[in-house]
Structures are given as structure tokens and as C-alpha cells.
């Protein structure tokens, strides 16, 4: 299988992942969880969102295996599901930071 020859189900999964990350609120939530496990309340406070809205987005992000949850006592803390998520986002931020060249503009 070449790098460009992927099964349809894998393409659909990847499209769904990018669709989820295409929502600015969800992307901010993911970014808030990258450096350390973070609780719903801390995410809500940091992003000035309601806890119920954050919880809704967290359910979607967990279902897509973008974030994982770990219970510690009565609180649940969220973090990146694996290193791929951090790497993907870091790479995309590097990509958008690259200067536009004359060749790109054509």
C-alpha cells in the first residue's frame, strides 16, 4: 500500500478528526489539555466557557480518541490521548507560521 492508497474508512475517520478540530472552541479545549491533565472546571475557567459546554465538547473529543480522561478522586482530568495529537498540532502551527513565498501565492 502506497502512502496515498488508504482505505475509505481510514479517510473518513481522518476527515472526522479534522472536522472536530476545525471547531475553534474544541481546538482551544484540546490545546488547554496538552501540557498537563486539566479538569472541566479549569478548562471552563481558562476559556470563559460554561462547564456544560466544555463537557459536551469533551465527550466528542474523547469519542474521537483525541483526548483521554482519568479520574482522580471526584474529579476527571483530561489530556491528549497520545503523542500523535500533540505532534499533529505542533506541526500544523509550524505550517501556518511559515512565510508565504511568491511561488505559494501563484
Short names for language-model regions:
Residues 30, 63-64:
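Extended rod-forming repeat segments used as scaffolds/tethers
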Residues 55-56, 94:
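Intrinsically disordered, low-complexity cationic segments
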Residues 1-13, 84-106:
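Amphipathic alpha-helical dimerization/coiled-coil segments
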Residues 9-52, 72, 76-84:
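N-terminal helix-turn-helix DNA-binding core of bacterial DNA-binding proteins
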Residues 45, 56, 62-63:
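Alpha-helical residues within the helix-turn-helix
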Residues 37-38, 62, 93:
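Residue-level detector of secondary-structure transition/capping positions
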Residues 60-61, 79, 99:
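Alpha-helical and His/Cys-centered functional microenvironments
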Amino acid at each position: 500500500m502506497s502512502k496515498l492508497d488508504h482505505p475509505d474508512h481510514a479517510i473518513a475517520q481522518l476527515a472526522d478528526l479534522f472536522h472536530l478540530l476545525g471547531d475553534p472552541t474544541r481546538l482551544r479545549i484540546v490545546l488547554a489539555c496538552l501540557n498537563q491533565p486539566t479538569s472541566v472546571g479549569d478548562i471552563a475557567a481558562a476559556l470563559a466557557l460554561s462547564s456544560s459546554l466544555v463537557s459536551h465538547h469533551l465527550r466528542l473529543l474523547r469519542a474521537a480518541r483525541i483526548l483521554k480522561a482519568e479520574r482522580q478522586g471526584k474529579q476527571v482530568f483530561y489530556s491528549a490521548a497520545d503523542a500523535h495529537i500533540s505532534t499533529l498540532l505542533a506541526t500544523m502551527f509550524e505550517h501556518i507560521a511559515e512565510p508565504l513565498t511568491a511561488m505559494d501565492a501563484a
